[in-house]
């Protein structure tokens, strides 16, 4: 969608964490970004000013709560408050990446469930809806008492790999850890490919002695995960696949954080190409073999469908050309 969207009572605002994806979303939706300013005082306090009226409007605030997580989260909370006090009709937040979603349970005694705390804070601030992309744990949706639309990136990845000819029985989709089996199976079903899993002994904290459940010998392997942080999970998994006879290894993740040193780790790993979405804007160096796949069209269409009260279900599937839609 490139023409100006007709309904001017919907407005998009971008905060500072990921302006590039916000600009793409705005262009795809045909809705220009609203005018606002955000600045940080010397003591760290954040000041926001909305530079146009939002009275009676439906507001969508775009912000990834990635590094620096707490600054970006507080900027979002302050913007929500500004919109509420300016008499916006509804305030909706678009989180291409939802920080703290990995803290979704008590893994050890006396640990907090910070994902629930953040959900409470956002809800209490006054939001009406959340649009996000590939939550680390889907149960985080249940931490909110408002609608949460968790969009999936697997259909985007399936379309990309199908165009590259990476599908069928010569390809195997691999989960680099047993917790990602569902994600791997989803991509494998789109590609008509088998799956494999890399598992580790409980005392293998460095993940160096993994073993493969499934057949990868003589096949092209696609590693899939939701968050690429330090790169160690993909790097070690790729080495295991190479030792096990995989001919080529590709990797794909929804969110490319690329924490310090990740580029060095991944560039020495036997990975042909790494695909991530543009959900996170990082200041760290990115490996040379990384390809960015934009999720902006997907998010833009979701925003328009929500505003027009249309179902989002068509966004959760990818139908390869030549397949019967019946």
Swiss-Prot record:
Ligand binding (ATP): 43-45, 102-103
Keywords: ATP-binding, Cytoplasm, Kinase, Magnesium, Metal-binding, Nucleotide biosynthesis, Nucleotide-binding, Transferase
Swiss-Prot/TrEMBL GO biological process terms: 5-phosphoribose 1-diphosphate biosynthetic process; purine nucleotide biosynthetic process; ribonucleoside monophosphate biosynthetic process
Cofactor mode of binding and number, as noted: Binds 1 Mg(2+) ion per subunit.
Pathway given in the UniProt record: Metabolic intermediate biosynthesis; 5-phospho-alpha-D-ribose 1-diphosphate biosynthesis; 5-phospho-alpha-D-ribose 1-diphosphate from D-ribose 5-phosphate (route I): step 1/1
Essential cofactor(s): Mg(2+)
GO cellular component: cytoplasm; ribose phosphate diphosphokinase complex
Residues given in the record as D-ribose 5-phosphate binding sites: 225, 229-233
Family: Belongs to the ribose-phosphate pyrophosphokinase family. Class I subfamily.
Cited NCBIfam families: PRK01259.1, PRK02458.1, ribP_PPkin
Name of the protein in its database record: Putative ribose-phosphate pyrophosphokinase 2
Gene name of the record: prs2
């Amino acid at each position: 969608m490139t023409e100006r969207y007709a309904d001017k009572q919907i407005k998009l605002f971008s905060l500072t964490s990921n302006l590039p994806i916000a600009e793409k979303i705005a262009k795809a939706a045909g809705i220009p970004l609203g005018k606002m300013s955000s600045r940080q005082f010397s003591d760290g306090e954040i000041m926001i000013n909305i530079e146009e009226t939002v009275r009676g409007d439906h507001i969508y605030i775009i912000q990834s709560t990635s590094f620096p997580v707490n600054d970006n989260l507080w900027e979002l909370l302050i913007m929500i408050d500004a919109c509420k006090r300016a008499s916006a009709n509804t305030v909706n937040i678009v989180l291409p990446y939802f920080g703290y979603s990995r803290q979704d349970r008590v893994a050890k005694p006396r640990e907090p469930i910070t994902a629930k705390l953040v959900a409470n804070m956002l809800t209490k601030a006054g939001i009406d809806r959340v649009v996000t992309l590939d939550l680390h744990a889907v149960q985080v949706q249940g931490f909110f008492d408002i609608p949460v639309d968790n969009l999936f990136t697997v259909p985007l990845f399936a379309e990309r790999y199908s165009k590259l000819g990476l599908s069928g029985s010569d390809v195997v989709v691999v989960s680099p850890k047993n917790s990602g089996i569902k994600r791997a199976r989803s991509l494998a079903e789109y590609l008509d490919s088998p799956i494999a899993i890399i598992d580790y002994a409980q005392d293998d904290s460095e993940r160096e002695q993994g073993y493969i459940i499934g057949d990868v010998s003589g096949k092209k392997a696609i590693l899939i995960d939701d968050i690429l942080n330090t790169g160690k999970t993909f790097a070690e998994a790729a080495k295991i696949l190479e030792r096990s006879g995989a001919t080529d290894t590709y990797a794909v993740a929804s969110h490319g954080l690329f924490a310090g040193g990740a580029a060095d780790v991944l560039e020495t790993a036997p990975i042909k190409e790494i695909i991530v979405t543009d959900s996170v804007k990082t200041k760290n160096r990115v490996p040379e073999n990384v390809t960015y796949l934009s999720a902006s069209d997907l998010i833009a269409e979701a925003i328009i469908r929500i505003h027009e009260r249309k179902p989002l279900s068509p966004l959760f599937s990818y139908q390869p050309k030549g397949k019967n839609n019946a």
